Amino acid sequence: MRISSTNRRHGLLILDTGPIRELVLFHAVSEFRLENLRGELRFIKEQESYGKCSEFVASFRQMTTTSASVVVELYHWIRETERHGQNKLWRRVYEEFQNMGMDEEVVKLLEMDASFIMRFGPVDGSLLELSRRHAGRNPMILTTDLPLYGECKKSGLSVYHIDEVTLKES
């Protein structure tokens, strides 16, 4: 199945922390020359992969959302990087959100399935809740997290692992 044809059926892209982090990291290494972060790149290591991921996100035509919990995970990651690059990383997060037309939604703990939270944590729980909340918009989750990916597949939710986007044939 071609990804571009899949996007036409899915109206909303829900982004996990991993894809956002990878896009920001690649830009930080390639544009800001923060070479100390190169070793953290896992999925987007060259311009072609960055382009494919950016193109995939853009194909949702400004219909992207994430959980406020994802922003907290980004904060914890950036806080652990070298101090001199933190402002640049935050500016890049803002740019990515603006470029994606990102909406950010709060999901309350009591709105999430307790057993899922106990197994996977509140961030993944919030993404699943967003998927359920927006079921009428045919949502798709993009993640780097294999346990979340597997749970989405098992639950019948639409999900892509970032490798399915970055490694696809052009």
Task: Tell what function each PLM region has.
Residues 1-10, 27-28, 115-120, 128, ...:
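Acidic, PIN/NYN-like endoribonuclease modules and their adjacent C-terminal/linker elements
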Residues 14-15, 24-81:
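PIN/NYN-family metal-dependent endoribonuclease catalytic core
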Residues 16, 124, 145:
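Acidic active-site catalytic centers that drive phospho-/nucleotidyl reactions
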Residues 50-57, 94, 127-132, 149:
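Short amphipathic alpha-helical segments and helix-helix/interface helices
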Residues 65, 103, 160:
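General small-molecule cofactor/ligand-binding pocket signal
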Residues 69-70, 90-125, 129:
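Acidic catalytic patch
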Residues 82-92:
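A charged helix-plus-loop insertion that forms the helical arch/lid used to bind
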